[in-house]
Amino acid sequence: MVFRIASSPYTHNQRQTSRIMLLVLIAALPGIAAQTWFFGWGTLFQIVLAAITALVAEAIVLRLRKQSVASHLQDYSALLTGLLLAVSIPPLAPWWMVVLGTGFAIIIAKQLYGGLGQNPFNPAMIGYVVLLISFPVQMTSWLPPYEIAATTPDMLDTLRMIFSGHTASGGDMTLLRIGIDGISQATPLDTFKTSLRAGHSVEQIMQYPIYSGALAGVGWQWVNLAWLVGGVFLLWQKAIRWHIPVSFLLTLALCAALGWLFSPATLASPQLHLLSGATMLGAFFILTDPVTASTTNRGRLIFGALAGVLVWLIRSFGGYPDGVAFAVLLANITVPLIDYYTRPRVYGHRKG
């Protein structure tokens, strides 16, 4: 079997690229607003740090490669990479983590391969996975949504936490993660996985404050719905195609429904999978990256379905509570194979 892969770059029209990237940035506003509302100012500060780091790192590498800095920065791809990484990490993560992750994403995962259009893996997810593997404690230290938080830091305390690790009164992350029940909180997916391992039943877990009166976790369901709104905007503007997000979400829902049907005492419900974690962010903003996703319609359906299966498997049986980043990167590996078998036949040419 011989793979015939068109030569890179795969993104040719800079004006079209800039327009798409700008639309994605605009579409991210509802998700950013929701995360800021439920988890505080840290989301915005992380975005600013990531954006500055992405632009500086991109400019330095472009200068070293003797390429035009201004024209490349105007495609907004560096900003988008920084944004996607920033909204994926905890809002109060130390400043150096977002700088390190964004720098790695731009320099190693993007520019080392030749820049936009030539990277085989999603740069933001490469940066995220590097941080998650290297600093698992910090990367899983999410604040509880303000509705169930015992203490909510203001803007200045948020800055102090990001740059020094303490609030003005001496509080630290351990204190800020305590909920109204006096117990340290985690994300709905993390809570579900760790509680099951501790021997708690699903019925007991669903009584925790993080799930109180919510389909998929207080705050998180609204965050996911906000990213869904942005995704619908992208579909309306034809900035992305429907194949990947639809196949991803349907496959994830199907796997979750079957698992829940046969083992409701140990596996999460479909609504928890669909409306918690990075599900909608991944479906519409990460998996749809035109550079690292499949390029044919049939291939996009397969690519999205594969990612959906992987997310469910990692969440249900893996060591990490979410799994979207790992699923994206594993699916990226299969793109050349998927495209090889799904590329339409060109009539008038015989197979070599």
UniProtKB/Swiss-Prot annotation:
It is found in: Cell inner membrane. The modification FMN phosphoryl threonine is found at residue 187. Its cofactor is FMN. Its EC number is 7.-.-.-. Keywords: Cell inner membrane, Cell membrane, Electron transport, Flavoprotein, FMN, Membrane, Phosphoprotein, Translocase, Transmembrane, Transmembrane helix, Transport. One of its GO terms (cellular component) is plasma membrane. It is a multi-pass membrane protein. InterPro entries: NqrB/RnfD (IPR004338), RnfD_bac (IPR011303). The chain crosses the membrane at residues 20-40, 42-62, 69-91, 123-143, 215-235, 242-262, 267-287, 301-321, 322-342. One of its GO terms (biological process) is electron transport chain. Pfam families: NQR2_RnfD_RnfE. It comes from the Bacteria. It is an enzyme of class 7 (translocase). The keyword Transmembrane helix applies. Part of a membrane-bound complex that couples electron transfer with translocation of ions across the membrane. Required to maintain the reduced state of SoxR. Belongs to the NqrB/RnfD family. HAMAP family: RsxD_RnfD (MF_00462). The complex is composed of six subunits: RsxA, RsxB, RsxC, RsxD, RsxE and RsxG. This is Ion-translocating oxidoreductase complex subunit D. It comes from Salmonella paratyphi B (strain ATCC BAA-1250 / SPB7). The lineage of its organism: Bacteria, Pseudomonadati, Pseudomonadota, Gammaproteobacteria, Enterobacterales.
